[in-house]
């Protein structure tokens, strides 16, 4: 749970967020100048995460894109991806420029918080706490995307997103040109203009340097523009709307698919409806069981969202120990453990993940003690070190919600 620097230093406080929500949130863009004493992520951290993200390219359904001169690279993409020997974004730029003089490039990575890792994610969550306390969490998701390179403008052109965006400038000079919604015809999320001609009437430029944060609401059209040189930025998108029916359908589908495994796929249908079956009997039974468990599944999903600050993809801490009855365990002082019961099931959620266990008073007392800041041990909770308590503590260790404490340190903390 430790960070090289205190993640709470990225909490801007209630006074800042009170003024921000009143003046800007969902209303108009702004630039937040140098809000942190230390950058939320260093250029070295971001470049190392870029290298780690290249592993995704080797998967079938990846969300990493590299473009050169505005064209997405496909077959030989690994030739141009960042490498450790590049050393930095500047080194990658020099390598591409040497091979392709005069060319520009862009690297895009979706859900980049996974590669940036646990410490970075804790900093972002602390940044969001004050905003969420005033406006609530986005019902769909929060996500960090990487935009990096020497590109002259956003490949997508002028467009709107369904998210409110905080753009953290990591390296270089970042410019986002924005227009209010009324500047262009209605018709969804519209992409234009072709060629080099871009309308500027009615636009505003958000210019940021390393350490600044650019903000624009989802209602604003926007496009990234070059101010010269390479730039690296992290866009934190907050996506506010989620479909209740869509969420339920996804949860039902996921649970049934897990149970069916390879039997979840059919290859063909009969030529005559006389031979048609709605689904194999095993599949129908799986659908029925998933439907019966829907209330628990929905509660777990929402608790995962809340405990994970709305991030759908969350990193894990690097160090996770074994559960021992003699050890003392203490909870994260920054982010609490959540508990809810649905019927006879207890749901525990922490750091964007959850577990469902049989409800018990002993389990509830353990979670309450941890959230009060009281270290706990299995030997002190129950004579036999109840298997469900072990499972709960193993889950909390896995998610980084608790850590072991020496007896002496724990006694000082009481």
Predicted region positions:
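Acidic, low-complexity/disordered tracts enriched in E/D and polar residues
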Residues: 290-370, 394, 405-414
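A residue-level signal for conserved active-site and pocket-lining positions in enzyme catalytic cores
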Residues: 32, 234, 396
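Short capping segments at the starts of secondary-structure elements
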Residues: 368-379, 402
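Active-site region of the double-stranded beta-helix
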Residues: 2-23, 36-42, 47-210, 222-268, ...
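Short amphipathic alpha-helical interaction segments
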Residues: 383-398
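Long, charge-rich alpha-helical interaction segments
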Residues: 250-309
